[in-house]
UniProtKB/Swiss-Prot annotation:
Protein name, as recorded: Histidine biosynthesis bifunctional protein HisB
Positions of region (Histidinol-phosphatase): 1-175
Family matches, as Pfam families: Hydrolase_like, IGPD
Entry annotation: catalytic residues: D10 (nucleophile), D12 (proton donor)
Lineage top rank: taxon: Bacteria
Length: 364
């Protein structure tokens, strides 16, 4: 049987809203669809098969009677079907965490048929869900995850990533693409950058938090990239982070090309619980001013001191003038906001606005 591209999709908190009071959808009044989930699935259905995978704690017990579950669930399925959205399977684990079953996500027993018969293509199948257990399920299946978030990764963005839609009005220009391979005694790196399309980024450096940060650059930069790095992580992550930045900066510089028609300048000032600022000029003159105070040495498997070093390396290989600053209390969020704001600013700089070189000197 031919392997298929399958989306294994969580239900509560992903397809429909999950009540924060009791985390149960046990009445029609609680049934609320996530924004734009139906238009997104309609776009995706010609490319992917859908399988619903859900944990429903205590389903069929006095704490969550089957009849209370069935009414809103059947209404949800009927609405999906009426709009032309069909799920090949609806797989539900009724157990609680303390039951110790092997079918509760992130365990894979619910998907045993798909694993044993090799029904899904690992290269083109994904788990979509809002929880860390969904991400872990994807890892256990050997596929990639997209973690749903109503703002940061909503259904519009998910459809955009999975369909790889063109995001730049590039006219008759050749699509801006670059590929860089960099091999040293410490690292073996390959970077591919597509500046004029979005899609799922395939990023594997061996440093989980760093992978997540690189994905933020591409996602908020409005482009697609693949990054593969095999580094000397048995020593530490320094060479991996530094050399990846050098390779990525080189790839971005090559993909941008002669800079004719680009906006060149960018400025972003987002305000969350962290205040992150970024200004950028693709000037051809490398410079960085970085202001951040980290109170922890590590976030996950990533050394916080490498944050500045990453941006310094990428600025100098891109030949960009870069100013970055962040304030806040949560170290994870501070670093993440820097990568996001860098991506957002880069998005402005590489935007095509015409055909002129944005410099009075006639050269950049």
């Amino acid at each position: 049987m031919t392997q298929q591209s399958i989306l294994f999709i969580d239900r509560d908190g992903t397809l429909i809203d999950e009540p924060k009071t009791d985390f149960q959808i046990d009445s029609l009044e609680k049934l609320k669809f996530e924004p734009n989930v139906i238009p997104a699935l309609l776009k995706l259905k010609n490319k992917y098969r859908f399988v619903m995978v859900s944990n429903q704690d205590g389903l069929g017990t006095s704490s969550f009677p089957q009849a209370d579950f069935d009414k809103p669930h059947n209404a949800m399925m009927a609405l999906f079907n009426s709009q032309g959205i069909e799920f090949d399977d609806v797989l539900i684990c009724p157990h609680k965490p303390e039951d110790g079953c092997d079918c509760r996500k992130p365990q894979t027993k619910l998907l045993q048929k798909y694993i044993e018969r090799e029904l899904f293509d690992p290269a083109t199948s994904f788990v979509i869900g809002d929880r860390a257990t969904d991400v872990q399920l994807a890892e256990n299946l050997g596929i990639r995850a997209i973690q749903y978030h109503p703002e940061k990764m909503n259904w519009d963005l998910i459809a955009e990533k999975l369909l790889g839609e063109s995001v730049t009005n590039n006219g008759d220009r050749t699509p801006r693409y670059a590929e860089v391979a960099r091999k040293t005694k410490e690292t073996d790196i390959k970077v591919q950058v597509w500046l004029d399309e979005t899609g799922v980024n395939d990023i594997k450096t061996g440093v989980g938090f760093f992978d997540h940060m690189l994905d933020q650059i591409a996602t908020h930069g409005g482009f697609r990239m693949n990054v593969s790095c095999k580094g000397d992580l048995w020593i530490d992550e320094h060479h991996t982070v530094e050399d990846t930045a050098l390779a990525l900066g080189t790839a971005l510089k090559q993909a941008i090309g002669d800079k004719r028609g680009i906006a060149r300048f960018g400025f972003v000032l987002p305000m969350d619980e962290c205040k992150a600022e970024c200004t950028m000029d693709l000037s051809g003159r490398p410079f960085i001013k970085f202001k951040a105070d980290f109170k922890r040495d590590k976030v996950g498997d990533f050394s916080t001191e490498l944050t500045e070093h990453f941006f310094q390396s990428i600025a100098f290989t891109m030949l960009a003038t870069l100013h970055l600053a962040v304030e806040g209390d949560n170290e994870h969020h501070k670093i993440e906001s820097l990568f996001k704001v860098f991506g957002r600013t880069l998005r402005q700089c590489i935007r095509i606005e015409g055909n002129e070189l944005p410099s009075s000197k006639g050269v950049l």
